[in-house]
Amino acid sequence: MQKSLVSLAWVFVAILGAICLGVLALHKGESINTLWLVVASACIYSIGYRFYSHFIAYRVLKLDDSRATPACVRNDGKDFVPTDKAITFGHHFAAIAGAGPLVGPILAAQMGYLPSILWILIGSVLGGCVHDFVVLFASIRRDGKSLGEMIKLEMGKFVGMIASLGILGIMLIIIAILAMVVVKALAHSPWGFFTIAMTIPIAILMGLYMRFFRPHKILEVSVIGFILLIIAIYAGKYVSLDPKLASIFTFEAGSLAWMIMGYGFVASILPVWFLLAPRDYLSTFLKIGVIGVLVVAIVFVAPPLQIPKITPFVDGSGPVFAGSVFPFLFITVACGTISGFHALISSGTTPKMLAKESDARLVGYGSMVMESVVALMALVCAGILHPGLYFAINSPEVSIGKDIADAASVISSWGFSISAEEIREMTKNIGESSILSRTGGAPTFAIGLAMIVYHILGDPSVMAFWYHFAILFEALFILTAVDAGTRTARFMIQDLLGNIYKPLGDLSSYKAGIFATLLCVAGWGYFLYQGTIDPKGGIYTLWPLFGVSNQMLAGMALLLVTVVLFKMGRFKGAIISALPAVLILAITFYSGILKVMPKSNDSVLNNVSHVAQMQIIKEKIALTTDEKALKTLQKSFFNHAIDAILCVFFMLVALLVLIVSVRICSNAYFKNQIYPPLAETPYIKAA
């Protein structure tokens, strides 16, 4: 009887979710209540976790708690430590939930709310959550090895070496785009810059406090750090109101890029306990706390989505990012649905912390469910804004101009009527000098959060504080990701350089570490700086390249797991990784090809393609006589050439992994030949 009631309850959940999703898809009004989205997502995620993740865990992967995990076998109290699954879940979620789920859906909102909602909900349950879960499983069974090492073991040394080069390149693009989000949020914002600058001495104070005064008191020091952050936000307001202080803390995007490069270099060579660890604790508590409060606030306020279900920009003519709904929506949403970056985390620190194999279900699948919830919240923050305001914030200066009146006129001509006064009022309410062309996701998310708080408290004067709190919240964990990403990429560079000159691969060598860090920062710093001087704002051209590379990395990770499952003889079960791998690679190969197509009569495709842009710029160079304009065009030509080369390189790496994967799987299925042999570690019984 009880079993029947439970089954009926799940049937009700499924029907309720389908009805809510149907309402979102078929609604024809100007706005729709966000509660339809909240209920639909709760139902779909519940069903996905309860049934699909259970099927994967016990019918496909066959998780075995009697088998000792790497954390138990190699417990050293440092890198390998068996940890409670709730703590491991928090660590893993904090590590994967970077800027991606906040930025991608906000950019994709230019096409309307419906395409993003469908892709986030369906794609994450069947693709992204599966990706994180199965890569974590593969790493657990291989002594916690990294993605590159696992590809080398399961597909051969040559493929592993090429894949490692590709992974490093993708990592540098990821760090650059993370830093770009911070630059876009802090440019010309003395309040924001002062607050973020204060987090450095606060983090150092926390590190010293925990190292020498109160060791291991993580909660205590995080509370102290949080109080100091709130004080810094309040102080930032008075800094912005004082003309002299405001001028000291106001910087152009280019200057901020150099500062972040310097910060990334210094932070990644300092001892972890001095800056990175305390900042990580603080950002983790902030991240989980803010997201939890925001979910409750959205349910409580239930603001209407004002952005249309589908906008005219599905054809790719939108100002925020280049490309049509297929395939560029998928690579734009990126981390909100599936992210190759997560494969690096799922094969990094997390597999070294799991106490039992069954914990991988909550940590791997469950954390990605939470990340896609963050993506939906970001979409809500963008969607509740007046569409005209959304485009004012996210359209590049070259499209709408510098003047508020001009921007309002241009945006209104697109069919999203807004007055200059409405833009000025929002600018004043959040305590900024301008909100025009602040593409990057962070300002849009922050304004959306501030508006939700305003609806609760009913006082517009609170918006400035909550806007800057949200900027602090985002910048804090993004800069933590920049620290950690630079450190991780440094290890990758040293591993590769060690094959050329052995001393450079010595991780204990301070000089080798500094040299590798310089190469790393130069790599991502180049893309960051070029993005800041890009006339379209950097995000317009960098984010699609990030999306293509990130999704290709996810495809390669899923191919690795498919190879592993075929070697284990689980041919039918391998469809759980093979199907999303084929879909993701098909989408990214198509988008990658479009990005290197020659010039055509289609203006949308020309905006997407780096090669087409090179041809257009070459024509302009031939007609330009002004020396300054000529230098700008030559720089732009060079940048597009680099982006095109990288795009082709990433596609070739993914194609190599795909070909080798097909060969290994076909040999295993048709000839029963397993080569290279399965690299799974021997079974050791758990204590």
Swiss-Prot record:
GO terms for biological process: cellular response to starvation; peptide transport; protein transport. Pfam families: CstA. It comes from Helicobacter pylori (strain J99 / ATCC 700824). Involved in peptide utilization. Keywords: Cell inner membrane, Cell membrane, Membrane, Peptide transport, Protein transport, Transmembrane, Transmembrane helix, Transport. It is found in: Cell inner membrane. Signal peptide: none annotated. Its main location: membrane. One of its GO terms (cellular component) is plasma membrane. InterPro entries: CstA (IPR051605), CstA_N (IPR003706). It is a multi-pass membrane protein. Belongs to the peptide transporter carbon starvation (CstA) (TC 2.A.114) family. The keyword Cell inner membrane applies. Coiled coil: none annotated. The keyword Cell membrane applies. This is Peptide transporter CstA. The chain crosses the membrane at residues 6-26, 29-49, 87-107, 117-137, 162-182, 190-210, 221-241, 256-276, 285-305, 325-345, 373-393, 440-460, 462-482, 513-533, 546-566, 574-594, 642-662.
